[in-house]
């Protein structure tokens, strides 16, 4: 059952404060609205209240059905295209040139732009960001020749660019947001029915699930929130896979950070996890390289794979692999966030890689691409491993994506080093070892060895995704150690309403530990509850 209610500004006699925003909130304000999905739970024995409870799974299935988009956009190039043309630097505009090149070479977005679908229905093409991007992509991919240079449209750049160095990731998020708003405006002009999605949401949008579990009664509450990009802490990670795994580790809420349990009626020790629930078609991974305090850059090497399996990091990692292929890498070359130079490497529709450095477009190979100090990584989901956007044979893709294969391969190599026998063909183990070393593999695709896949009764693969702009955190804020202020009832399933659009790109603490917001809605085992009722359960 889907419940849609509207709460007044004040409920339960309390004027509830607003929490800081997450950096993708503005984008999702009109996309999702405020929703809560749950069913009326019978009074359950505390011992039976767990993530594996059948009643809870029924509701989660409903949540998945409601949150999953039904977009029709292809994930691969409908017709192979060569690289786009170079872009003119109009004065400290390398950051926006790099971001625009990555968007231009995003397969599902480029195919939608080349279809001219938006401009055919747009009633206000003057000043429309979506029309401007459509014209930009069409000119770059279809009507240019080798060596051509374009000047980005002022419609795309003027609202953001002030002829000074800016953050490419911020411009990327700003551009996606304005394109989304343009799509919604077109729909409003032709149909008064509320529209809650757009091609931008369908391509880039995903959802993550937060879970808080009382360690005393085992009662569990779930919160769902949208994300547009996935920032990764790389301060101690050697690879993107390790950073994904590290951010999904369970966090204990103890002492002042303890969680108020609605069943125990007091603050109790709890565990908290945050991981991907609905995977996006296009995955943006942002490596947190810049200090929020000084702007200084963490210029360390972090490896990343050409092919990434996201399945181990899902909230429910079942079924086969969920493969993604790298198609763009945005790079910052410099010492601080307000200096240096931006460029990118992109994979064209015909499968070849190119370095896009303002006006210069040069051929490069995947080896050099994987050696860059990446800032933003762009992956597209692969539903068909034989698509042109993947250069590797299907069998090799399965090998690269399967962590179990990588572990077995490593063990075989160790055994061969200790063996001096020959096989039936007379080939010595030493020769076989040399031959094996020539095989291309993605070492960073391995699951970290220290990970216990079945620890404390929790499923493996939990990824903590904090959609937050790293350059706008409040000083001293620690996302993994925020004070618990929210009293979630047991077995609650909450879908957060996006916050105010006023602070795009501001800090994003873990929302399940923040006060309730006007408009958030919830249905629990005790029935429908308002934010005021939640806060009056004895936790204040």
From Swiss-Prot:
Residues 1-22, 431-461, 499-540 are annotated as: Disordered. Residues 85-382 form the USP domain. Signal peptide: none annotated. Keywords: Apoptosis, Cell cycle, Endoplasmic reticulum, Hydrolase, Nucleus, Protease, Thiol protease, Ubl conjugation pathway. Its main location: nucleus. One of its GO terms (molecular function) is cysteine-type deubiquitinase activity. InterPro entries: Papain-like_cys_pep_sf, Peptidase_C19, Peptidase_C19_UCH, USP_CS, USP_dom. CDD domains: Peptidase_C19E. One of its GO terms (cellular component) is endoplasmic reticulum membrane. It is found in: Nucleus; Endoplasmic reticulum. PROSITE patterns: USP_1, USP_2, USP_3. It catalyses: Thiol-dependent hydrolysis of ester, thioester, amide, peptide and isopeptide bonds formed by the C-terminal Gly of ubiquitin (a 76-residue protein attached to proteins as an intracellular targeting signal). The active site is at residues 94, 341. Residues 431-441, 508-520 have a biased composition (Basic and acidic residues). Residues 523-540 have a biased composition (Polar residues). GO terms for biological process: apoptotic process; CAAX-box protein processing; negative regulation of GTPase activity; negative regulation of protein processing; negative regulation of protein targeting to membrane; positive regulation of GTPase activity; positive regulation of MDA-5 signaling pathway; positive regulation of RIG-I signaling pathway. Belongs to the peptidase C19 family. USP17 subfamily. Deubiquitinating enzyme that removes conjugated ubiquitin from specific proteins to regulate different cellular processes that may include cell proliferation, progression through the cell cycle, apoptosis, cell migration, and the cellular response to viral infection. Interacts with SUDS3; the interaction is direct. This is Ubiquitin carboxyl-terminal hydrolase 17-like protein E.
